[in-house]
Curated annotation (Swiss-Prot):
PANTHER family: HYALURONAN SYNTHASE, MANNURONAN SYNTHASE. Signal peptide: none annotated. This is Glycosyltransferase alg8. GO terms for cellular component: plasma membrane. It holds the Pfam family Glyco_tranf_2_3. The lineage of its organism: Bacteria, Pseudomonadati, Pseudomonadota, Gammaproteobacteria, Pseudomonadales. Pathway: Glycan biosynthesis; alginate biosynthesis.
Length: 496
């Protein structure tokens, strides 16, 4: 039965790839022979110039990622292995935050955490930051089932359901009261993250090898409780994430401490400044005023580490498996909702991260952060120019653009195979969907940085503003969005 399912999957994948290649050939055949005449020079120049920037950034990430994954990291891993027991921590704290996650997923998560606490062999405390009594009863029943040895302890922290940031802060303070020493480490684990076997032993040695690394994060795979496209969309995201993380790890500047599973020095998470940064992070915006961050605790923890002078790292062979629950049944609605949260978190941190300066961040990290700001426009330039050229000179230019997109996304998909993640025939289309819809969402969010909400529960940031300030924020955001988009299109109409 299992072999038949695998065969069916392979046949469907092959059919998908054949369909994709057939569409590319049809577009190529539809192109007129004289398409590249003198009228097309501005079109080719614009698409090519922006393409050089965008693809050079992607190629740089890919090359750096491969150098780290297949060259630098294996060398460092051998170096760690030679250190032997000298890399062992004095104590491991596995802190899990849970809120409104289905019981089956919660049981999977805590079972994996308890097993890892037992199997890692280090003195370990499992710290559970819980809101609901049902979760506490479930954890206690699993604890009784596994019956851990004496060196593995359980500490339950009950909190109000006021948000993940509060849950993390209460957990950090609970660990602080246990007075961990300088050699202790803390893993921060989300309530939908299942730990793979050996993840603790694979992550703890790096804090001894790199004395200035304050936090590190891990490779992610996912199980999606949704349809085929939603599943492929998440898997594509994790494959891209893996390469980008490897690239940034080459300079010890991984750009986020992923909330799903990251590990920190205990001296970091017990630092009052770090706790305050995670619990009550805020931004002073020139137009929107000061507002607190509701989501994006992973970005806050990263920024705090950078501000406090620490490095960040990535462990590609330490894997976790996340259980993804799409916030909507519709792929379009769910993906936009998730993009809104992710890109909002990214952009809220971006400007102040650049403010840390070149000396603290390094040249490459500064360029990457700058690229995150301009990519919302450069990602749309090719499509916009193609549409304008088609209106002015004929539909053939749109066909050229579609063929270019089809070929380049196919190449990008093949390159993703080097990440060790599987790829499917939907990946080229999803890559382009992410580029265009993602750019539109970034532009929308960029002018509304104060608008935040969780996807798992209907919780949004509430600001007690005067009626005029609310009106001004709303209409100034709309005006600036319309003005920026109009200028962008008008300039391209003049140039093409």
């Amino acid at each position: 039965m299992l072999n038949m399912q695998r065969l069916q999957t392979v046949l469907l994948q092959c059919a998908g790839w054949l369909l994709y290649m057939s569409l590319l050939m049809l577009i190529a055949l539809a192109l007129p022979a004289d398409i590249f005449d003198s009228q097309s020079k501005h079109f080719i120049f614009l698409v090519g110039a922006v393409g050089i920037w965008r693809y050079s950034m992607g190629a740089t990430h890919f090359i750096r990622g491969m150098i780290f994954l297949y060259g630098v990291y294996p060398y460092l891993r051998r170096k760690v292995q030679k250190m032997g027991n000298a890399t062992d921590p004095s104590h491991v704290y596995l802190m899990v935050t849970s809120f409104r996650i289905e019981a089956l997923t919660t049981a999977q998560v805590y079972s994996s955490v308890i097993r890892e606490a037992i199997n890692c062999g280090f003195p370990t405390t499992v710290v559970c930051s819980l809101v609901e009594m049902s979760d506490e009863l479930l954890v206690k029943s699993l604890w009784a089932k596994y019956n851990p040895p004496a060196h593995v302890k359980l500490d339950i922290v009950r909190i109000a359901g006021t948000g993940k940031r509060d849950g993390l802060a209460y957990g950090f303070r609970a660990i602080s009261r246990m007075l961990p020493d300088e050699n202790a480490v803390v893993a921060v684990i989300d309530g939908d993250t299942v730990l793979a076997d050996g993840v603790v032993r694979k992550t703890v040695p790096w804090f001894k090898l790199f004395p200035n690394v304050g936090g590190l994060t891990t490779n992610e795979f996912c199980e999606v409780r949704g349809g085929y496209i939603m599943s492929e969309w998440h898997k594509l995201r994790f494959a891209q994430r893996h390469i980008n993380m490897c690239s940034m790890a080459l300079s010890k500047r991984v750009l986020t401490m992923t909330g799903r599973m990251s590990m920190f020095r205990a001296s970091v998470v017990t630092n009052p400044e770090f706790i305050a940064d995670v619990e009550s992070d805020s931004l002073m915006h020139w137009r929107l005023g000061r507002f607190k961050f509701l989501t994006g605790d992973d970005k806050s923890s990263w920024f705090s580490l950078m501000r406090l002078g620490y490095d960040t790292f990535y462990v590609p062979d330490a894997a976790i498996n996340t259980v993804e629950h799409p916030p909507e049944k519709s792929f379009l609605k769910a993906s936009r909702k998730l993009m809104y949260r992710w890109y909002g978190n990214n952009l809220r941190q971006n400007s102040r991260a650049l403010g840390l300066g070149l000396r603290r961040l390094g040249l490459f990290t500064s360029i990457v952060l700058f690229d995150q700001r301009v990519s919302m426009w450069t990602s749309l330039l090719g499509l916009t120019v193609a549409v304008i050229a088609s209106l002015k000179f004929g539909m053939a230019f749109l066909l050229v653009y579609l063929l270019w997109i089809g070929i380049t996304r196919l190449i990008l998909t093949i390159m993703l195979l080097c990440s060790g993640h599987n790829v499917g025939p939907a990946y080229p289309l999803i890559l382009y969907y992410n580029q265009i819809i993602g750019a539109l969402m970034k532009i929308y969010v960029f002018f509304r940085l104060d608008k935040q909400s969780w996807t798992r529960q209907p919780t949004a940031l509430k600001r007690d503003l005067a009626s005029f300030q609310q009106w001004f924020n709303t209409w100034s955001s709309r005006t600036m969005t319309f003005s920026a988009a109009s200028i962008f299109v008008a300039v391209l109409f003049m140039v093409v």
